[in-house]
Each structure stands twice: as C-alpha cells, then as structure tokens.
Amino acid sequence: MISTDAVAPAVDVKGEAGDRAATGNIFLVGMMGAGKTTVGRLLSHFLEKTFYDSDREIQKRTGVSIPTIFEIEGEEGFRRRETEILSELMNARNIILATGGGAVLSGVNRAMLKHGGTVIYLRASIDDLWRRTRHDKNRPLLQTSDPRARLAELFVQRDPLYRETAHIVVESGKRSPRHLAQSLAQQLTISSRTG
C-alpha cells in the first residue's frame, strides 16, 4: 500500500504563480480521477476564463473515444496527439486547461505547461482515485487484471513529475469540487493582488 499521508498544504502558492493566474493560463495536472475536469470547469466560471479539457479536444478532432485511439494507435500515438493539442493551446490566453493524467510523462509537455501559465497539481490519495475511477471503462490504462495495482503504479511514477511541473499543489480528496475551486479562485485572486 502506498502511503499518501504526507501531503502538501491545501494551497501552496510558489513565486509568481498568482500573478500568472490573474492574467494568463491555468493548467490542471494530476492523476485520472483527481477532479481536473470538474474543478477546472468550476474554476473557469469563478475566474471568468475559457475552459478546455485536452482529452475532449483530442476526441473532438479525431471523432473517436480515447480507448479507440489507444486501441488503434497505442499509447504512443495518443501521447503524440496530446502533445500536439497542448502545443496549440499554448497559443491561447486566459484559459483553464484540464490535462490528461499522463501529459507530464513528456519532458516537452512539462516544459510547455510550466512556462505557459500557472500549473496546479490536484493531488488525491490512491483510495480516492480508485473510488472515482473503478467503474469507468473509458480509462484504457486501467483495463488490466488488477486495475487498483496499476493505478498505484501510475501514481508512484507520475507524482514526482506532477510536483516538478506544478506551481501549486492542492489536496483534492476531501473537499467538494465547488469548495476546492472557490478556495483556489480566492487564493489566486489574492496572490495576484499582493504579488
């Protein structure tokens, strides 16, 4: 069992993240099931920014589901498409983008995100992630004989990359998405004013 007891403070703003959030882009990173899409939509409403979800953008452009892309092109093909979408969205302004859980696997993606806006890592425990994803058949990486163990492996692999990329780390497990988004919006607004 992976211990997730030692977690970051609820909101930890580093450096000029608040300034970037007030005028620029906000990118949400984290594991599948962390709440990126739900919190991102709410945060976009509170901060009056346009919301995008990279997985949905890929689906809109290809006309097929993520599992179908994995089946036809493999994970490598999907990751290539993900990088293309991220690269295009880096030209946008005043957006909130929920990235796919594996977006941080690419060093190119990590650099684009880190330098293109404020990166918020929505972190949740393995138990919370499992509870949110265990019945979702649209998660190709969890279609294994032991999906919970696979989720734990992905967490161990990706957590350091999320932390490396993020300007802000937020525990998303125990608060409602609305409360979390309100708290983030307030903190980002305060940080941009006191910068």
From Swiss-Prot:
Its cofactor is Mg(2+). Mg(2+) binds at residue 37. The keyword Magnesium applies. ATP binds at residues 33-38, 139, 175. InterPro entries: P-loop_NTPase (IPR027417), Shikimate/glucono_kinase (IPR031322), Shikimate_kinase/TSH1 (IPR000623), Shikimate_kinase_CS (IPR023000). Keywords: Amino-acid biosynthesis, Aromatic amino acid biosynthesis, ATP-binding, Cytoplasm, Kinase, Magnesium, Metal-binding, Nucleotide-binding, Transferase. Substrate binds at residues 55, 79, 101, 158. GO terms for biological process: amino acid biosynthetic process; aromatic amino acid family biosynthetic process; chorismate biosynthetic process. It comes from the Bacteria. SUPFAM superfamilies: P-loop containing nucleoside triphosphate hydrolases. It is an enzyme of class 2 (transferase). One of its GO terms (cellular component) is cytosol. It catalyses: shikimate + ATP = 3-phosphoshikimate + ADP + H(+). Pathway: Metabolic intermediate biosynthesis; chorismate biosynthesis; chorismate from D-erythrose 4-phosphate and phosphoenolpyruvate: step 5/7. Its main location: cytoplasm. Pfam families: SKI. Binds 1 Mg(2+) ion per subunit. It is found in: Cytoplasm. GO terms for molecular function: ATP binding; magnesium ion binding; shikimate kinase activity. Catalyzes the specific phosphorylation of the 3-hydroxyl group of shikimic acid using ATP as a cosubstrate. Belongs to the shikimate kinase family. Monomer. This is Shikimate kinase.
